[in-house]
């Protein structure tokens, strides 16, 4: 269990270091990713107003209805495409990618690749 808590503490330290440098504005909001053991979440956030402009997760009805039990990297890529499409509907094409302390590998990388495929630039 000690290993698990040190992993969490290390991720939170990385998150603080990243968050000092990354902020989202109205013209270039922040694409924030959260990864749990079972699901992945993505939000496009304007930090100036503190509002979420677009969001998607593996718990969305639209994702569950259209996808046949996608898991892992495939689900993350689909969520990246979904959040990218929702951001483009709102007129957002440029974002700042916030990996939220998670390593840029696996599902986090797959989500960013899916968002780039949808047309987001970062």
From Swiss-Prot:
- Physiological role: This is one of the proteins that bind and probably mediate the attachment of the 5S RNA into the large ribosomal subunit, where it forms part of the central protuberance.
| Family under the similarity heading | Belongs to the universal ribosomal protein uL18 family.
Organism name: Desulforapulum autotrophicum (strain ATCC 43914 / DSM 3382 / VKM B-1955 / HRM2) (Desulfobacterium autotrophicum)
Alphabetical list of Pfam families matching this protein: Ribosomal_L18p (PF00861)
Q: Output a single Gene Ontology CC term carried by this record.
A: cytosolic large ribosomal subunit
| HAMAP family for the chain | Ribosomal_uL18_B
User: What name does the UniProt record give this protein?
Assistant: Large ribosomal subunit protein uL18
Keywords of the record, alphabetical order, are: Ribonucleoprotein, Ribosomal protein, RNA-binding, rRNA-binding
């Amino acid at each position: 269990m000690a290993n698990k808590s040190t992993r969490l503490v290390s991720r939170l330290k990385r998150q603080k270091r990243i968050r000092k440098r990354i902020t989202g504005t109205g013209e270039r909001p922040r694409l924030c990713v959260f990864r749990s053991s079972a699901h992945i979440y993505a939000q496009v956030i304007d930090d100036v107003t503190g509002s979420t402009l677009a969001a998607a997760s593996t718990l969305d009805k639209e994702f569950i209805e259209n996808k046949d039990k996608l898991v892992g990297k495939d689900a993350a890529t689909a969520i990246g495409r979904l959040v990218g499409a929702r951001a483009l509907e709102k007129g957002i094409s440029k974002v700042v990618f916030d990996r939220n302390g998670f390593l840029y590998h696996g599902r986090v990388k797959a989500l960013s690749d899916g968002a780039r495929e949808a047309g987001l630039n970062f």
